[in-house]
Amino acid sequence: MIFLPVTSVVFAISWIYSGVSAFNPYSSTPYSLKYVDEQEFLSVIDNETLLQEGRLFRPYEGSDVLCYQRNTSSLIQHHEEDTFNSEGALIEAVNMVNAILAPNPIEMNTVPISYWTYIISSGETRTVVQKGYFGETYLLGNSSNYNSTIDYHFAKSKTGRVYLSETLVDGCTCDLTHKPREVEIQYICPKRPLSRPFHLEVREIQSCKYQLRLFLPQLCELSSFNPLLGQLSEHNIICHRSGSKLSPALDIFNRYSATVLDHGIYLLKPKNSAKDRRQLMYHAAEPLDSQTTLFELTVEERFIGDFISSLKKLIGSDFIQSPTGKSIKPGDLFLWRAPVVDETGNLLFLIDLELNSASEAIGKVNNDASLLNELPIHNMVYFDSMTVNQTDETSSNSLPEKSTGLVPDIFATDEIESPYKGGTAQELKDKLMEAFRDIGYPDIEVEILEEVVEEQN
């Protein structure tokens, strides 16, 4: 247990390192959220045709901001029909899969790791072999048609996501059914960026009938797996505040792009990194009633709870970076500090995140605003990369090797879900995701890129 002075609020951190970031239609999908003046907004909502093609909504209950979003459900529907009926789209997807899997056999374990590993080979035939820890093997299925489209078809999951299905039959005989084993491979564009080339999940849906769900990031580049690919740039949301009186928060969004994290927390990335540093914006959820424990908590205490719950997602967003703008890697030791502001841009407090050489992850919230005067623009109070030190024999700052047992494996989590509901940021995110569901795309994640039209003098 780590103790800091009583003037500081301290909490424990579970530190998760993120893998590479890449374009992914299911995570951090950009939407242009533009605030306009009254005249431009009325030109939209007074247009009957546009109203029939879209919807009006408020970012959260009680908000005096009204937003319009055009509805493209018919375009999505037509795209899905084209995908399922297009031989060209099927050939394109099959070719992509074969380019990834061939020519060398691919051996992988499931996530989470199990007793079995799985080997997919693509030679004269495509085979899937199940291999046990002590070397026992079972042929789950094979196909000599993997270079054609005979054994493939597009399908849709229960959540509406398109995937490519391939069925392999004639595996070794099952001891229970006395029939050949068979396996279906589902090739899927992952919801979030992966920290490894492949992600495998396996289920035995019936005795000796298997389902392999293989997540391949490269599939996200194909429009067959992403019906909004190439069209999101044309899909904008416009908003207007009644009385043309804009909130001071909009000045923040003139200078920063904002990503909704969770629990009322925004990640603010400066549009001019030479002028502004990264910071967090926080809106504490209101208590549900006078009896709730939230009512008795300070803003700092409520932030700590919300921040801990959102920490995995924060690390996965690559928001915390080295002084040179590179992703944090295992072995990096640092103290990262950032201001936390409210919706009007007023400083609430500072948040410190430290990972030290004793494998201790420490978080601290304090109200010493003077620390901002000496804070580097890149937010790192200090930074030392053990990876660099270990390869530099002449370095005088080489750090001793330490156990990282308190730091979770960098490959521990690919997809992070949060059941929490509440707070302005979460409500805004929910509304935008509801809009996505209305246009037939239920699994999308939303990143809000704020653009404000400045008044002309």
UniProtKB/Swiss-Prot annotation:
Q: Which GO terms describe its cellular component?
A: endoplasmic reticulum lumen; endoplasmic reticulum membrane
Domain MRH residues, every copy: 104-222
Per the record, the coiled-coil ranges are none
Q: Which InterPro entries match?
A: Man6P_isomerase_rcpt-bd_dom_sf, MRH_dom, OS-9-like, Yos9_DD
Entry membrane topology: Peripheral membrane protein
Q: Which UniProt keywords apply?
A: Disulfide bond, Endoplasmic reticulum, Glycoprotein, Lectin, Membrane, Signal
Residues bound to a mannooligosaccharide derivative are: W116, D175, R181, E204, Y210
Check the UniProt entry and state the signal peptide residues, or none.
1-22
Say which domain of life the source belongs to: Eukaryota
Glycosylation (residues):
N47, N71, N142, N147, N389
Cysteines joined through disulfide linkages: C174-C208, C189-C220
Any one Gene Ontology BP term:
endoplasmic reticulum unfolded protein response
**Principal location listed in the UniProt entry:** endoplasmic reticulum
Q: Where in the cell is it found?
A: Endoplasmic reticulum membrane
Task: Return one GO MF term.
Answer: carbohydrate binding
Signal as UniProt keyword: yes
**What's the family?**
Belongs to the OS-9 family.
Subunit structure, as described in the record:
Interacts with missfolded ER lumenal proteins.
Job description of the protein: Lectin involved in the quality control of the secretory pathway. As a member of the endoplasmic reticulum-associated degradation lumenal (ERAD-L) surveillance system, targets misfolded endoplasmic reticulum lumenal glycoproteins for degradation.
Tell me the protein's name.
Answer: Protein OS-9 homolog
Which source organism? Kluyveromyces lactis (strain ATCC 8585 / CBS 2359 / DSM 70799 / NBRC 1267 / NRRL Y-1140 / WM37)
Question: Which gene holds the coding sequence for this protein?
Answer: YOS9
